[in-house]
């Protein structure tokens, strides 16, 4: 089910507070956050967030294309190493 239209988009209060401070100070520093479930709001355009993936902070530059999506979508938590191939045994003559 999708979120009710009556409710506003979820954004953690500390993420809003950090973003408001960055907007007020006009700094281009990376804002490190752990809240992967927060929705990217229109006021975040131009800011860079470091989204935690469990090990490191992945930088996410907010543009108008990604407004309305969640921060966690841009910070993968698992590394894809490729599909397992056939392990063919080589025979010597």
UniProtKB/Swiss-Prot annotation:
Cited PROSITE patterns: RIBOSOMAL_S19
InterPro entries: Ribosomal_uS19, Ribosomal_uS19_bac-type, Ribosomal_uS19_CS, Ribosomal_uS19_SF
Keyword Glycoprotein part of the UniProt annotation: no
Keyword Ribonucleoprotein found: yes
Pfam family, one: Ribosomal_S19
This protein's UniProt keywords: Ribonucleoprotein, Ribosomal protein, RNA-binding, rRNA-binding
GO MF annotations, alphabetized: rRNA binding; structural constituent of ribosome
GO CC, any one term: small ribosomal subunit
Leader sequence residues: none
Domain of life: Bacteria
Example of a GO biological process term: translation
Protein role: Protein S19 forms a complex with S13 that binds strongly to the 16S ribosomal RNA.
Family of this protein: Belongs to the universal ribosomal protein uS19 family.
Record PANTHER family: RIBOSOMAL PROTEIN S19P FAMILY MEMBER, SMALL RIBOSOMAL SUBUNIT PROTEIN US19M
Name of this protein: Small ribosomal subunit protein uS19
């Amino acid at each position: 089910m999708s979120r009710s239209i009556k409710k506003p988009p979820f954004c953690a209060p500390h993420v809003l507070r950090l973003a408001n401070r960055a907007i007020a100070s006009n700094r281009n520093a990376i804002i490190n956050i752990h809240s992967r479930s927060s929705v990217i709001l229109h006021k975040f355009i131009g800011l860079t967030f470091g989204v935690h993936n469990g090990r490191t902070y992945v930088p996410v530059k907010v543009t108008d294309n990604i407004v309305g999506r969640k921060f966690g979508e841009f910070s993968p938590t698992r590394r894809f190493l490729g599909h397992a191939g056939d392990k063919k045994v080589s025979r010597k003559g």
